[in-house]
Each structure stands twice: as structure tokens, then as C-alpha cells.
Amino acid sequence: MSLKGNTTMRFIASLSLLALLAFTAPLPAQPPAQIWVVSWIGSVHGPYPSGNPSAQPDMKLAFPSAEAGARDQSFRMIVKPEIWGREARLRLSNALGTRPVTFDGIYVGMQFGSSAVVSGTSRSVTFDGKRSVTIAPGAAAWSDPVALAFVRNPASTELWGRKLAVSFHVAGESGPMTWHAKALQTSYLTLPGAGSRGHDESESAFPVSTTAWYFLDALDMRAPTSAYAIVAFGDSITDGTNSSLNGDDRWPDVLARRLRAVLGNRVSVVNAGIGGNQVVGPKDYSPLMPYPGGPSAGARLERDVLSLSGVSTVIWLEGINDFSRNGNATVEAVQAAMKEGVERIRARMPGVRVIGATLTPALGATNAAHGFAEQDEKRKALNEFIRASGVFDGVADFDSATRDPATGGLKPEFVHNTTTGGDGDRLHPNRLGYIAMGMAVDLNMMRPLAAKAAP
């Protein structure tokens, strides 16, 4: 065979070997499948100022007219993600508004402190590729995914407890504002007419403080398919009345820290509490007929539970306001509404675990609408239903964790007000009481019942 022939054969053999190696070599590692998981929510009600805020400054300078609402001003909402990812998306809400609201100048970045943003972390947020979005009355809108370049390792313990600053500008007048009154978290805004300031990372750009959240009602993160969310659904005792301002020591916060210590960045516990909320009432709720406790549990179930991403468990603590002089509901009516709510959750979210939480005591409460004997008898009857009816997949026994056997009311050490100091109302536990509640939840009940598929 000629030299040329040998060369040709060697070339063909080399190609064959390369083809074989290409066929047998391992494929490049594919990025792990991910899903959206809700990382934070602020259940909306309103319109402002209807609600039950805690430690809220006088907002008349920022909002001279509740009817006009925000006017050409910017907001910087401070929120604490319960799970981290390299991509996020935001939901802006006009659920309780009466006019279309246009938002622009929307940014998300890492909070530095106060209203300052860590330099260089602000990222512009778009909606359908645009830098502004107009949301109709009664509606909400999800943003496009936004890359959080500053989140290099979502599993890093250095991110635990860190907060995001979500900034946006209201163009023109908003009209009545959708809000969450009892944030127990300081956020910031500009004065009317200040224009779009969301890009400004300095703290001087946002001179007004608030302890409420406006318009922003949900934040999702992209997370591995093994990640999941737990929704704490309830009233002021879930919302955190009497806990400490900026302390993140409501019972869902305590539960979240326990789970994170065991599971790391795989589980999110989000708070869907609204102060004054009821299971049954009010029968009629609208921006024109608001109630400080927001729409009934059934009326807000879609927005605050069923529409959320990656949910595996719902813990439902509610009913004491139904049995107050503001509610006057029967035990049977609350039981029926709870059964219906659980059925809706299971129909829309197959495999989701629904945990019933026993109601904490209110006997002897100083609040005029609470604390009387008939309310306590109804509370005991509902607690027996929660424990024994079989409607729920498990029970979080907050009654046993907080009740003083000697008096039937809250344990004395749980009464002192840890938001503003002074005497508590014997209805809402304080910081220590919420810690006891968060510690009373069996972590084994927090495991998903069913695996979630990637979208």
C-alpha cells in the first residue's frame, strides 16, 4: 500500500475513534430542573387606610388624600425572602383599587440598611419586556424573571435573614391604594411629586418611613424541584400583632428558622395573615365597602393561597375574630367555611397538606370585642373540631402552647406588648408567645405529601 493510502486509512481510523469517543463520552451536565417557589407575600386588603397597622407613623404628609392615593411618587418596599434563587419575579397588585395604576421605574436590589441599597445590586424589572405596566382595578401582574447577579450561591448561609429592596414609581395618581397594613417592617417612600427614584441606591432619596407594604404582594424565586413553600394562613395572630417591629419574630418566622436550620435553602414559610381577618365574614367586601380585617378567608383564598407557587403545606389558624362581637358567627358556620376552604385547596392543589391550628385563648382580653365567656366556649368547640373531625391532615396545637391552665387565658409571660411596650391586650401573644407557637409545630408535618413536577 502506498504512503498516501496508509495516511488515508489512518485518517479514517482517527475519525472513527473520535466518533466513538463522542458517542460514549458523558454529555455535558445539564442545569438542574427548577421551579418557581413563593418566597415572600404580603396579603393585601384595603384600600388604604382601612386596616390594622402597628407602629405606623402619621402618613398624611405622604398621602394627603386617601382618595387620590399616591401621586407621582416612589416606593421602596423592604421584604425578607424565605428562599433564595438566582432569578426572581414580583407581583404588583391593584386588587382593591378603583382606577388603573401605572408603575414604572421598577427595581430590585439588596438592602444595605435603612432605605439604602447595596451599591451595584439594583436590577431593572420589566413586565412583558416593558419598563412600565398598567394594572386594572381588581387585577395584579407578574413581572418577567429578573436575574439577581448578586446572588452567587443561593444556598449560602450568608443570605439568611438578608432583605431585598423593591422599588417602583407610581405615575400620576393611583387612586385608592391596595396595601398590607401590618407589615411590622419599616419600608420607605418619597413625598408626592418626587418622580421616579427607584434607580437611586442612596437612603436620602426616600425620606418617608412606613410600617406597611403598598401594591407589592408576592415575590417568587427560582429554586430546585426539591424546594417547597408553606403558607401560614390566618388573622392578626399570624400577622404578628404585638411582636417586635423589624424583629421577624412572628410564629411563621420562628417556624421558618427551625426548618432552615435543618433543610437549608429548600423551604419557604410565607405569611398570609391579615389583622382582624375572619373565616366567614364580612359578607360584602369591596373598595367601596372595606372592612379593616380584609375580605373573608374564603374570598381571599385564591389570591393568598391557590395562586402561589410551589406550595406543599397550608397551616390555617383562624376563627377567633368570627366569635368576637365584630363577627358573632356560629361555630357551625365557621366549621362549614373551613371544610369548604380545605376542599378548594385539595381540589386545586392535589397533594398539598392542610394543617389545622387550634385557636389561642382570648379569655379576659381587654379588647372590647373579645374576652367574654361565650367566645371562649365557641373557641373550645372549634378547637375540638380541628383536633378530631378528620378534616385536616394534622394539627398544630397552639392552644396548648399558649394557654394558662389556671386561668384559661394567655400565659402571663405571653401578655406584655413587645411592639410598643406596656400592657398587652390578652388577645395577642407577644414575641415570647409567638416563639412558643413556632416551636410547637411538629416539623414532620411540614414534609411535602407529594413531589412537584417542574413546570
List each model region and its residues.
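Alpha-helical scaffolding within the catalytic cores
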Residues: 74, 214, 252, 292-308, ...
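N-terminal secretory targeting modules
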Residues: 2-3, 29-233, 238-247, 263-264, ...
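Catalytic His-Asp segment of secreted/periplasmic serine-dependent ester chemistry enzymes
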Residues: 278, 284-290, 294, 298, ...
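Phosphate-binding active sites in nucleotide-utilizing proteins
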Residues: 239-240, 247-276, 280-282, 289, ...
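Positively charged n-region of N-terminal signal peptides that target proteins for export
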Residues: 2-12
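Bacterial N-terminal signal peptides
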Residues: 14-22
